[in-house]
């Protein structure tokens, strides 16, 4: 195609992208001879979540464009496309030797490959590291938990639940509840209901065991819940009773954001002394 002919096709490609018609966009881009243009469109496609690209599509792109912008994002997404049914354990291990896992799921995929080769020491470290933060679908959660059952303990499930709660990934947290010890199940059920703005919050909080009533995460979720409903006095009640130290707060950055929002509301009400006290 000449430059004159390529221009309307490239415009057509962009139009397909804007409409999220990626199959048509990719076919359209293939008609353009300019390699840089085709590479750009492929890059845009591979960055979209839920695409139908295979691991091989990602692998080819990464190998040919190792200096491309946001290549680590592409590598991270590539990890989610690795499946033992399509790749041998050796090829997966070789890939990760050149491209160390960037996400929790990547570590789990590598652990799975090592498990096939009976290398349990490598499996244990990777699965414990990856389990906490991995982005796992509902179906994969059950699959991986069953597959790595002898390596994962209640403590590992608790670490994952705590991470998901602080990151406010409440649907993922809900799926984890059944794997937690009963007392922790009650704590994280209350947190999950608070952050997802679901019914039954008061009832769930009343069931939280006494030893967790002053849990930092629970207090944080209650604070946020009250603040979002404009309950400044109720929010203050929590802020004034908790320990304001890093060890207790767990995530001081999140607490600070809530404090600053509530402090602004107090300043607006001319309650300067109280605003000063909580900041």
What are these regions (language model features)?
Residues 2-7:
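Short, small-residue-biased leader/transition segments that mark boundaries at the very start
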Residues 8-21, 159-164, 221-226, 262-268:
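Alpha-helical segment of the N-proximal tetratricopeptide repeat
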Residues 12, 42-45, 78, 110, ...:
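Structural register within alpha-helical repeat arrays
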Residues 26-36, 47-50, 59-69, 81-83, ...:
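Solenoid-like repeat scaffolds
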């Amino acid at each position: 195609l000449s430059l004159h002919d390529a221009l309307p096709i490239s415009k057509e490609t962009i139009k397909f992208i804007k409409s999220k018609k990626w199959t048509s966009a990719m076919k359209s881009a293939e008609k353009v001879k300019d390699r840089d243009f085709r590479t750009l469109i492929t890059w845009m496609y591979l960055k979209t979540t839920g695409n139908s690209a295979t691991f091989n599509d990602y692998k080819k792109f990464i190998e040919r464009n190792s200096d491309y912008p946001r290549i680590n994002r592409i590598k991270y997404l590539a990890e989610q496309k690795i499946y033992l049914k399509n790749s041998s354990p050796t090829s997966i291990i070789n890939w990760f030797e050149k491209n160390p896992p960037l996400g929790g799921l990547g570590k789990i995929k590598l652990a799975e490959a090592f498990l096939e080769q009976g290398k349990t020491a490598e499996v244990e470290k990777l699965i414990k590291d990856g389990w906490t933060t991995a982005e796992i679908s509902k179906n994969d959660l059950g699959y991986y938990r069953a597959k790595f059952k002898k390596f994962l303990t209640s403590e590992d499930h608790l670490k994952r639940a705590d991470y998901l709660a602080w990151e406010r990934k409440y649907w993922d947290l809900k799926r984890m509840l059944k794997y937690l010890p009963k007392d922790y199940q009650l704590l994280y059920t209350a947190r999950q209901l608070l952050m997802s703005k679901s019914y039954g919050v008061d009832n769930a909080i009343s069931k939280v065991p006494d030893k967790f009533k002053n849990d930092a995460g629970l207090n944080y979720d209650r604070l946020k819940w009250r603040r979002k409903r404009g309950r400044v006095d109720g929010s203050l009640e929590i802020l004034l009773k908790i320990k304001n130290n890093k060890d207790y707060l767990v995530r001081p950055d999140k607490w600070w954001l809530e404090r600053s929002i509530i402090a602004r509301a107090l300043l607006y009400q001319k309650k300067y002394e109280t605003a000063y006290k909580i900041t």
